């Protein structure tokens, strides 16, 4: 229940505030950790393809463990102080994991630069949110790049984090952000990241497999609420969702292309190398600047639907768990009250301590480590310096021997 409340609060803060410039961000710390470990492992591991792949696996495991364990430890410590402190801290963590308003703001900077006719400024603005080379892009290519990155990051930056936060709270959310950040920094097929980025890239494909497909379906639902062409969106999704090197990237891009009636993807330059890509969608019309705010609204509606879905799925389980805890507390309280009343009505009869049983004296006399002077305790006759378990074993074995 507390994690679900933190998710809702963090989502609302993200919609209102976004990521203020200059405010410390955990993802920046994760990125610095990745860079430091990458440099260190490149110096330590062999300069061979297998050595670099091993370095990538070590880096992935170390970053994931640290990124998950540190938030979990902080939440546990804050919970010891107060549950309200834990709620506040986890709400801030959820806010920093989500990226709805920041993605919308950065893409709208591209829109504003395009509307003002400043191609250089629009290239610079779009370079902040895409990984491709932007110095060769024209007006339409800049617009297409902005629409593509918003469509793709609807899954990576909005839907998938919401799902992981709903399942496991802030620690699992930071686990996802670590996996996604490593893929963004290292998951390239060109040197020097070809080998060291293999494990981070494949891990990101596995982690995003289900969220990417859920994102596509939720985006279709959002398009229906916005009055877009959902029939074309479903048709392009079924046809073009595999037209990408990544098994996940084209899921939401194909839906977006069909809903907007434009053509996305195509050839792109990365680190000076031209990558041939298939087009996604049909060119029912030319892409325009207005498609950028349109896809931003589509992303926001998709995010709200994801939050509602997450709350609707998790809330019954949270209430059931709370109900079980309440029932358990009531049962324990009833048992305690019953025992107290029965003790008051039927007080126990005081008994006098009897002398040690004959079998104990006989057994202790034959044991050199025992004393002949037993001590009465609540559990029976036991020597103080002797472990209780050993004395019980001797007593039980001796009693059995006597009975037989």
Task: Give short role names for the model-derived ranges.
Residues 1-175, 179, 187-326:
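Hydrophobic alpha-helical transmembrane segments
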Residues 392-393, 397-403:
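Short, intrinsically disordered C-terminal tails of secreted or membrane-associated proteins
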